[in-house]
């Protein structure tokens, strides 16, 4: 969980970013946000144009067109991530302190029900469209809880080889999850609800954020030792490593621009271009703000949203909350 937030938005033109040899990025606009408490993962709901922020004891909804706070969903304890099930217009929010998942209505911004999970500290959370299940990655018990979205009940528990972090689905029956304490990547078969492969990510250390290119079958793990590890999703072969900023916590891939993003605690956003399935190059390290480690990609606008805190003493009152829009000058 991060510190109270300053919200940043970075906007990138699809064509300009993909083809510019030396792109020049800058912060373009600022929005006030406000509010107290830490945060974790960010999620874009493209249907409502909402940025959903896991904000410690509540979900904050920010209008991605105006940058204004439009609502909050309270009554939570220590939330981490939000998985969207668009067909049902529901969100599933992992609550690490309550060992549960809160089901929210994405249109009314209300809590519908709570689902206790069979693990401790549910953190990363992902929807797998192939099975219709939501999976929570339980950081303190080393397992994944499987929730059937038709019944909103836990239907299986999957033993994992270590402490799970972020997870992604390929939409074809597999979920991939970084194993932070082992420097590994695990593959879950969502038909059998079992891990069917585990791959070593060395020289990557402490992988956190994870993204996927479902077309080229490439996985992007961002690591604490300033590396992005690129892995073949079918064979587990390491395709490449790419230098990124320090202290990453999230990764995103934009299929329209072929860009991979790493948001880093050192106040940079590393942008990597996928030239082809086996070749990758850094095109920019965009200054953001120290602490801006988590992000969301808006696929409609190709904008990147991040959050960070205004500098201040530990436990000091929150102030100077601002949304920043950045892109090519």
Regions found by a protein language model. Give the residues of each.
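N-terminal secretory signal peptides that target proteins for export/translocation
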Residues: 1-2
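Bacterial N-terminal signal peptides
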Residues: 5-16
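Predominantly soluble domains enriched in secretory-pathway, periplasmic, or organellar proteins
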Residues: 17-329
């Amino acid at each position: 969980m991060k510190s109270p937030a300053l919200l940043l938005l970075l906007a990138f033109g699809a064509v300009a970013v993909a083809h510019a040899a030396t792109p020049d990025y800058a912060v373009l606009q600022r929005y006030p946000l406000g509010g107290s408490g830490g945060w974790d993962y960010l999620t874009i709901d493209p249907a409502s144009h909402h940025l959903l922020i896991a904000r410690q004891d509540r979900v904050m909804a920010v209008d991605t067109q105006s940058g204004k706070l439009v609502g909050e969903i309270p009554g939570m304890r220590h939330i981490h991530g939000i998985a969207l099930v668009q067909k049902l217009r529901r969100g599933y929010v992992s609550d690490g302190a309550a060992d549960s998942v809160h089901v929210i209505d994405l249109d009314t911004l209300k809590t519908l029900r709570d689902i206790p999970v069979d693990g401790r500290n549910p953190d990363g959370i992902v929807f797998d469209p192939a099975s219709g299940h939501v999976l929570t990655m339980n950081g303190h018990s080393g397992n994944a809880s499987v929730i059937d979205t038709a019944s909103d009940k836990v239907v299986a528990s999957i033993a994992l080889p270590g402490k799970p972090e972020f997870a992604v689905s390929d939409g074809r029956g597999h979920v991939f999850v970084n194993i932070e304490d082992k420097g590994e990547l695990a593959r879950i078969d969502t038909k059998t609800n079992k891990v069917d492969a585990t791959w070593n990510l060395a020289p990557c250390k402490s992988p956190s954020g994870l993204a996927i290119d479902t077309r080229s079958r490439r996985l992007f793990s961002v690591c604490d030792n300033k590396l992005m590890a690129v892995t073949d999703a079918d064979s587990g072969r390491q395709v490449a490593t790419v230098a990124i900023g320090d202290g990453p916590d999230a990764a995103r891939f934009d299929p329209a621009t072929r860009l991979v993003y790493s948001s880093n605690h050192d106040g940079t956003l590393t942008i990597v271009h996928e030239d082809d399935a086996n070749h990758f190059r850094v095109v920019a390290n965009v200054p953001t703000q120290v602490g801006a480690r988590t992000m969301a990609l808006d696929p409609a606008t190709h904008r990147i949203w991040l959050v960070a805190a205004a500098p201040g003493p530990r436990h000091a009152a929150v102030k100077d909350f601002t949304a920043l829009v950045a892109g090519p000058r």
